[in-house]
Amino acid sequence: MSKTLSFKTYSAKPAEVERKWYVIDAEDQILGRMAAEIAKVLRGKHKPQFTPHIDTGDFIVVTNAEKVALSGKKIEYKTYFHHSNYPGGGKFDHVKDLLKKKPEKVIEHAVWGMLPHNNLGRQLFKKLKVYAGSEHPHTAQCPVELKVN
């Protein structure tokens, strides 16, 4: 009297995904470690319903972006390269200057590098909200604080 077991692989459906809102305080957090955790939550890998080709992730609000920490001497030596697509249009920005002018860009750049670079990755990236100060306009969504080690 043995039963035949039938194991089916679960595939999440976009309409069934329940999304939560999380807030992360970036003050004194190591940039790379925090970005890896953010990418994991945006992708939905922390959920048992994770499906690689479906957006199963949650929303992330990052505050205090200007107070993020970088390990080692990266604050002095790390640079970001971008190009205007004109001849001689290559530019280098130091992370120290970028943290003063646009601190949100530092976190966004780190997280974008850890997401897939396709349509799904662009959809996931839209769920990341980064703010320089401690205030954010998403209090109506009742975000839960997420601790990052």
Curated annotation (Swiss-Prot):
Gene Ontology biological-process entries: negative regulation of translation; translation
Xref: InterPro entries: Ribosomal_uL13, Ribosomal_uL13_bac-type, Ribosomal_uL13_sf
Pfam families membership: Ribosomal_L13
CDD domains: Ribosomal_L13
GO cellular component: cytosolic large ribosomal subunit
NCBIfam families in the record: rplM_bact
Listed name of the protein: Large ribosomal subunit protein uL13
Organism: Chlorobium limicola (strain DSM 245 / NBRC 103803 / 6330)
